[in-house]
Amino acid sequence: MARWNVCSYCGKEFEPGTGKMYVRNDGRVYFFCSRKCEKYFFMGRNPRKLKWTKAFEEAKLQRAKRK
């Protein structure tokens, strides 16, 4: 059985054979579940500031623990 990929931007798991894989010249590999994630990644948007990403949820939990 093939491994599920995790989006490098939003953190969502997606099926093998879907999405897009981007490999940089230095060998780092990025997986994207959608064109939206890919665009936001290359535009330099911070995933911690977008409510629909897993990084936002994790940052939100850490902020709640501090208070």
Swiss-Prot record:
Zn(2+) binds at C7, C10, C33, C37. SMART domains: TRASH. InterPro entries: L24e/L24_sf, Ribosomal_eL24, Ribosomal_eL24-rel_arc, Ribosomal_eL24-rel_N, Ribosomal_eL24_CS, TRASH_dom. Gene3D superfamilies: Ribosomal protein L24e. Pfam families: Ribosomal_L24e. A zinc finger (C4-type) spans 7-37. Binds 1 zinc ion per subunit. GO terms for biological process: translation. It comes from the Archaea. Keywords: Metal-binding, Ribonucleoprotein, Ribosomal protein, RNA-binding, rRNA-binding, Zinc, Zinc-finger. Binds to the 23S rRNA. Part of the 50S ribosomal subunit. Forms a cluster with proteins L3 and L14. This is Large ribosomal subunit protein eL24. It comes from Thermococcus sibiricus (strain DSM 12597 / MM 739). The lineage of its organism: Archaea, Methanobacteriati, Methanobacteriota, Thermococci, Thermococcales.
